[in-house]
Amino acid sequence: YNGLLEVYVTGFPTIHSSNNNYPVPQIMLPAQIGEVTESELVQIDNAIFVSGGSLFSGNNTYDFTSGGQSGKIYIRSNHPLIGLTIPVGPISLIGISSQYTFSVPAIDGYQILPRDTNDLIIPSGLIITSAVTQSNITSTGFDLTWITSDSSTTEANYAVSQPLTIHVNGNSYTKAHTITLTGLQPATFYFVECFSVNGTDTAFSNVGYYSTASNSTGKIRPYFNHSVDNSVSLGVDAQNITIYFNDTIKAYMDRADSTIDICVYNASDATIATAINDAYNRGVNVRYIADDDVVNSMLNSLNPNIPVVYRDPSVQGIMHNKFVIIDAHSENNSWIMSGSTNWTNPSNLFNDYNNLIFIQDQALAKAYTLEFNEMWSGVFGSNKSDNTPHKFNVNGIEIELYFSPSDNTTSKINEVIKNVNYSLEFALLSFTRDDLA
């Protein structure tokens, strides 16, 4: 099952020998890991983790690249690596070749299982010892900072697409590096690889994906369907709109000029269905992604020409998003809708305590569109990649955006918890992560 082999031993096993030496790991590239290597010890050199600088958490996979190929490791619950920093630069990665898949036949899902901290071998010499951090985000540039083990140069290669053809030199020889990218375009995403040189030794970061700020208004509008207490508000006051949740969603859809992308777990509301059909009838390009394992009765009321993609049922999990993207490529009419609300009437829209958040920001809308397009192409769950920028400057407010499971959301939440000084408040329907507890 799941590409795994279960061995059941009747009675007591026979020990033929013990205290044997471990086999020498086989050095290979990620693409060579497969059926013929399962249960064998393998080694990947020059492996660079996509999420370098974050923290390892249990029951999670982590993507890496080596030699232009991609691979995954899996960290089980209670693993010795949990809570430790994910290496930033190239390492030698050792582990047991394994597989976990829901595909039939089982021809994918290959991964490496590191046994302990000794299976991540950090090379001697110059290395990057911190995550690359983005700051001072403007519509024309941003700063990137990192730390190295020894004094070295401050450099980066970047471009809007790979290969990274533009080189910038920070002209500083130090351990604490800051480089500034300037002359960039608003609401535009850039691939950046930071690196430092000391003599003949060079340390590279993973290739990061970063966004400039947009020139949008940055309006943020939170709504709740039950009472709110604005006396404790520290920002934009929330509004209690009670029975008008569906009507509010419709009102924003009515603003769309060119595109509406909808990604919602479950829906059964006639008012919202009417808004979607009206948008399609006036020439708006509408796309809809839904989960495959719930009723979604509202979809029967949509114009049959509106394309709908259901989550791939062969991949474990559910598609639990609730977001809408309106006119993503418009500076002033781009909106994203997020929040906790499914579109089920009356349960989620009116009875259960839920919220909606609308943000007018082109950069955020374009990032949500990247995630939408990945799922629109049929990629869901553990097959997704960490392919969006994560930090945004929305009219002076820093917003971070992560999608699960590809973006190591548990690790990001854990980092926030570890940095809490005085109080932590959260509102959740379900809480099952022991590592966060």
Q: Which role does the model predict for each range below?
A:
Residues 48-51, 98-103, 151, 161-164, ...:
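Acidic glycine-/aspartate-rich tracts in secreted/extracellular proteins
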Residues 46, 95, 260, 323, ...:
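A residue-level signal for conserved active-site and pocket-lining positions in enzyme catalytic cores
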Residues 1-125:
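OB-fold nucleic-acid-binding modules
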Residues 124-214:
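Short, surface-exposed linear motifs at loops/turns and structural transition points
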Residues 29-65, 248, 255, 259, ...:
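Surface-exposed interaction/gating patches
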Residues 104-106, 200-206, 348-350:
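Beta-sandwich strand segments
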